[in-house]
Amino acid sequence: MNAAVVRRTQEALGKVIRRPPLTEKLLSKPPFRYLHDIITEVIRMTGFMKGLYTDAEMKSDNVKDKDAKISFLQKAIDVVVMVSGEPLLAKPARIVAGHEPERTNELLQIIGKCCLNKLSSDDAVRRVLAGEKGEVKGRASLTSRSQELDNKNVREEESRVHKNTEDRGDAEIKERSTSRDRKQKEELKEDRKPREKDKDKEKAKENGGNRHREGERERAKARARPDNERQKDRGNRERDRDSERKKETERKSEGGKEKERLRDRDRERDRDKGKDRDRRRVKNGEHSWDLDREKNREHDKPEKKSASSGEMSKKLSDGTFKDSKAETETEISTRASKSLTTKTSKRRSKNSVEGRKEDNISAKSLDSIVSGINNEPNQETTTSEIGTKEANINSTSISDDNSASLRCENIQPNPTEKQKGDSTSDAEGDAGPAGQDKSEVPETPEIPNELSSNIRRIPRPGSARPAPPRVKRQDSMEALQMDRSGSGKTVSNVITESHNSDNEEDDQFVVEAAPQLSEMSEIEMVTAVELEEEEKHGGLVKKILETKKDYEKLQQSPKPGEKERSLFESAWKKEKDIVSKEIEKLRTSIQTLCKSALPLGKIMDYIQEDVDAMQNELQMWHSENRQHAEALQQEQRITDCAVEPLKAELAELEQLIKDQQDKICAVKANILKNEEKIQKMVYSINLTSRR
């Protein structure tokens, strides 16, 4: 991302909006939520694109679906193209996916220019809401015959590419068993083909466009389109091409997903088969047989490698394994003779009893293995393994008939040899699935049955998730250790045929007196009990057993001289218990005292501080009371001085009121007297008039 583009965006939009912040980090790869906030802020601040979105779309929480985001951005792009008249190459789907930050910044720059130039967007909003797509004004319609032919050719090629991709997807699903290298090569070739076709299309379109332009220039110069319209046409073409490529990539991704699902199913089936085989082998004691078989294979490698892959396939198809039987029988007999001559007389004497037991165990384990092989008809095995199995079956049948002529001797392998065997088996298990086809027969037939599923397993594609962690299988070692708990010898898996007579066998072996069965059983029982106690008992059980032993010792009958001592000890223990209880009580009381002393001391400290504060406050209030009392007295003196003349005036007024009241009373008395006189005079006049 160029820093100059971000700077231009900051200059254009920084004058229009203040938030969200136009930082270089956000503008270099703008997320949709950031673009949504910018557009809503532009609408709120300037009114540009007002009415384009509903109230629900203005809230970013409602625009979470991919289609909703694409439609949101498409509306904004259409309005900006209509208002500005400039072509925009930004694709909403690419913007939502986080691609094309430069074109996204170009969109933001044009929005800022429209807002700064105060261009009206009402007409464009109306047209976009009516369903019209954003196009540059004055764009000439491409109605020439050459352009139509180009479009037809493009459509035909698109249909061919679509059919080819579908056919390829079907073929890839059918051929999912091929190796990763071949698939990668085929996919590279198939990816190159549509690219080359796209290049041819672009060249053909450019040639057709050039011819068309030259013809138009010669026919009519007035119809010449401006540069911006040509750029818009190119942008639309590129947009169509991008959409086509997206569709193709989506189809390919869908096909790849189907392939991955099928591969995962095959892998799960192989894993389940491998687990079932492991369980059967653990049950039947086949792990020890596999270890011995791997040791035997190390001797058989040069002879088995000489057999060609064609002969092996013929043997497998026809079912004739006579040559392999003969070879395995001869190898078994030679190995048995070598092992018999190299054994010492001491080991023979020690294993004389154990060998008889182990003969039965080996026969049983081989029978179980044969039954397990018959139960798995779909299991793929190499010719060498089949030959050894048949040889073992023949040897078991011979051992049933001639049990006296068969002997098995075992030597306990060293731990270094065990580690080597494990490491080699792990290495073979890891190197199994590396680039092998089904049609090819493996050169090393020593691969065990566990690896047959790994060979048939399809390699993981590069786009797959990381594989789960591998669990290290230690079942074989655990099974061996459980089998060897009674004795330190392993059970031999090869039952050799001896064509010699009984006398020759007696000459080869040195027979010694075997220990009695009762002694052997006692030794085995003691070792088994000790092992079980060591393995089963944990720390708690051991402590319980120790306490039980101590208790049993205490319950034994005491001696006569120890009675007094025991009484003294019991009395001493009682006194000790009483003293310890009193000490414990004292300790608890001291602890409670200490616990209460600390908060008490803190309270006392706080009380002292509070008392000082209260005394200071009391003095303050006393002084304030004194001041207020003095002020009150001063005010009283002032009021007294001011009220004295008023009091004198009041006294005068009261005196005047009394005088006036006296005058009124005197006037009333005169009026009453005059009325009496008038009445008397009227009465006297009436009397005189009557006369």
UniProtKB/Swiss-Prot annotation:
Q: Which parts of this chain are annotated as the region Abolishes microtubules-binding when missing?
A: 1-323
The consequence of V125A is: In SLSN9; results in altered folding of the N-terminus; does not affect interaction with IFT20; loss of interaction with MAP4
A cellular component term, taken from the record's GO annotations: nuclear body
Gene3D superfamilies in the record: Microtubule-binding protein MIP-T3
Question: Basic and acidic residues bias: where?
Answer: 147-328, 351-361
Which of UniProt's keywords are assigned here?
Cell projection, Ciliopathy, Cilium, Cilium biogenesis/degradation, Coiled coil, Cytoplasm, Cytoskeleton, Disease variant, Leber congenital amaurosis, Nephronophthisis, Phosphoprotein, Senior-Loken syndrome
Cite the residue spans of the region called Disordered.
136-508
One matching Pfam family is: MIP-T3_C
Q: Which InterPro entries does the UniProt record give? A: TRAF3IP1 (IPR018799), TRAF3IP1_C (IPR041476), TRAF3IP1_N (IPR040468), TRAF3IP1_N_sf (IPR042576)
Q: Where does tissue-level expression of this protein occur?
A: Ubiquitous.
Q: Where is this region: DISC1-interaction domain?
A: 223-691
Family affiliation: Belongs to the TRAF3IP1 family.
Where is this chain compositionally biased, Low complexity type?
Answer: 391-405
Q: What is this protein called?
A: TRAF3-interacting protein 1
Q: Name one GO biological process term.
A: regulation of microtubule cytoskeleton organization
Q: Which gene encodes it?
A: TRAF3IP1
Q: How does it assemble?
A: Component of the IFT complex B, at least composed of IFT20, IFT22, IFT25, IFT27, IFT46, IFT52, TRAF3IP1/IFT54, IFT57, IFT74, IFT80, IFT81, and IFT88. Interacts with IFT88. Interacts with IL13RA1. Binds to microtubules, TRAF3 and DISC1. Interacts with MAP4.
Where are the Phosphoserine modifications? S317, S476
Q: Which residues form a coiled coil?
A: 571-666
Question: Where is this gene product found?
Answer: Cytoplasm, Cytoskeleton; Cell projection, Cilium; Cytoplasm, Cytoskeleton, Cilium axoneme; Cytoplasm, Cytoskeleton, Cilium basal body
Please give the clinical condition linked to this protein: Senior-Loken syndrome 9: A renal-retinal disorder characterized by progressive wasting of the filtering unit of the kidney (nephronophthisis), with or without medullary cystic renal disease, and progressive eye disease. Typically this disorder becomes apparent during the first year of life.
